[in-house]
Amino acid sequence: MNKILRGVIQFRNTIRKDLVKQFEEIKNNPSPTAVMFTCMDSRMLPTRFTQSQVGDMFVVRNAGNMIPDAPNYGAFSEVSVNTEPAALELAVKRGGIRHIVVCGHSDCKAINTLYGLHQCPKNFDVTSPMDHWVRRNGFASVKRLNERLHRGPSSMKFESEVAPSQSFDAIIDPMDTLAMEDKLSQINVLQQLINICSHEFLKEYLESGRLHIHGMWFDIYKGEDYLFSKDKKRFVVIDEKTVTDLLAELNARYPVPEDQDGPVAFAKSN
């Protein structure tokens, strides 16, 4: 708490004035362009590595950047009283955003826990909320990892029954350079995109092209951001050499609706 309180004092003496001014400027017309689901890991600073400013995007954080599959919440048609679907509704139906981003990262402690439980199920602690969280919501990702290990770096199909247009193919770690946990982390990001599609209240937005979902991955120790390219079927590092092609893919796949002006919101923010 000492560090937190002293940080508040530093904030008051440095950027507070400018930040309040920014709050005032967007007070009556906030216009976030995306909602990002990312991990609660203290090393993950999404507003820094995307250089987002006040009002640019919603950010939702939890252990392992997971958005549980709709059936995991309860009976069919049961209202989900949970953070993740509530955040999706707030951002999409009430906030009007057009882009959902799921951003995972390397050396993720939640994913490491999931992989550890997969390797040694007897270590599952029935009293641990964390163990229950990652096992329940990471099971599909573990199945995908097993598929990847069995088939090698070949294309895998990620399919959505609710929103078929959002299905895609992916090749995970084609050069086999990542640790097993990081392979699982990338798979987990893509599985969350399918999980998002499972929420019926988003179907009309997804199928009509009013809403788009994206997978990102951050390499903690290299400081490199990756975007999943549906054209290339893999995570592609975002740098000066690739950004033009990535933006071209985004604009081709997600054209701006006739009632909107300017470039794709997600592309514009990058």
UniProtKB/Swiss-Prot annotation:
Gene Ontology terms, MF aspect: carbonate dehydratase activity; zinc ion binding
Disulfide bonds: none
InterPro entries associated with the record: Beta_CA_cladeB (IPR045066), Carbonic_anhydrase (IPR001765), Carbonic_anhydrase_sf (IPR036874)
Protein name: Beta carbonic anhydrase 1
Entry keywords, A to Z: Lyase, Metal-binding, Zinc
Assembly notes: Oligomer.
EC number: 4.2.1.1
Annotated cofactor note: Binds 1 zinc ion per subunit.
TM spans (from-to): none
PANTHER family: CARBONIC ANHYDRASE (PTHR11002:SF76)
Catalysed conversion reaction: hydrogencarbonate + H(+) = CO2 + H2O
Biological process according to GO: IRE1-mediated unfolded protein response
Function statement: Reversible hydration of carbon dioxide.
Keyword Ion transport: no
SMART domains: Pro_CA
Family under the similarity heading: Belongs to the beta-class carbonic anhydrase family.
Protein residues bound to Zn(2+): C39, D41, H105, C108
Cofactor requirement: Zn(2+)
Pfam families: Pro_CA
